[in-house]
C-alpha cells in the first residue's frame, strides 16, 4: 500500500478539522518508514544506511494543573531515524491539542504521557523535552559553511534529479547550506519551506550543481523526513563521500516544525539550533 493511499484513508490532512475536547491518543497516525524507503531502493529488511533523528518543535502546547490553571510550554520531540514509523503531522497537532483541557499534577506527568504514547506508535523510545521559560530558548544561528544561494545559476528542473550532482577528483571536508529548499505536502499540496545543510568528506561536490539539485525539489511532493532521506541517498550514491550528514530545518506549520537529520556517523549529539527563518 502506498504512502498516499494510507494517508487518504486514515489521515485528517485535507479534511475538515474537528479539534478534540479531551485527551485523545488514538488520533496519532503512525506511517511506516519502509513505504518511502522502498522507493529509494533501500533494503528495508536491514537497518537503514544512516543514523539520525527527526526533531519536532511544538509551539502550541498547553494543559491544566490540578486546580484548572493553564500552563504552556514549547515541546521538543526527538524520534530516532531507526524507528519503524514516523508520525503524520496533522495527527500530531490534533493529539497535542487534546491536552488543552486535561489536568495533570505537573509538567513531568504531561511529558511522560506524551513519551509513552509516541514511543508506542513508532516502536522506539522517543525523547520529550519541555521548554518552560524564555531563558531556555536557543538563539538563532547560521551554519558555519558556504552559502550556495549567492551563486548565479540558470535552472528549469523542478523535480528531483540526482543526475544534476557531480564531483571532482579533489578530496575535501566542507559544509554547504541553502535556504532555497522547497517541497510540498503529498496530500494537500501545501508548500514546505526549509533550509538544508550538508556536511561531508569526500570528492568535492560541484557547488553550482548541488544548488540546482536542491532547487529541483521545488515541485516535488513528499514528507519532510522522506525528502531528507532522498537527499542523503542521492548524494551518497552519486558523490560517494566517505562521510555525510544532511539536515534540514523546515519552517513551522500548524504550530509545528520538523527538522530531520541523517548521517553516516553513528555518534552524534542532538542540536536544536533554530534557523533565522524559524
Curated annotation (Swiss-Prot):
The keyword Metal-binding does not apply. Residues 255-278 are annotated as: Disordered. GO terms for cellular component: cytosol. This is NADPH-dependent 7-cyano-7-deazaguanine reductase. NADPH binds at residues 89-90, 253-254. It catalyses: 7-aminomethyl-7-carbaguanine + 2 NADP(+) = 7-cyano-7-deazaguanine + 2 NADPH + 3 H(+). Residues 261-278 have a biased composition (Polar residues). Belongs to the GTP cyclohydrolase I family. QueF type 2 subfamily. Its EC number is 1.7.1.13. Homodimer. Catalyzes the NADPH-dependent reduction of 7-cyano-7-deazaguanine (preQ0) to 7-aminomethyl-7-deazaguanine (preQ1). Substrate binds at residues 87-89, 224-225. Keywords: Cytoplasm, NADP, Oxidoreductase, Queuosine biosynthesis. It is found in: Cytoplasm. One of its GO terms (biological process) is queuosine biosynthetic process. Pathway: tRNA modification; tRNA-queuosine biosynthesis. Its main location: cytoplasm. GO terms for molecular function: preQ1 synthase activity.
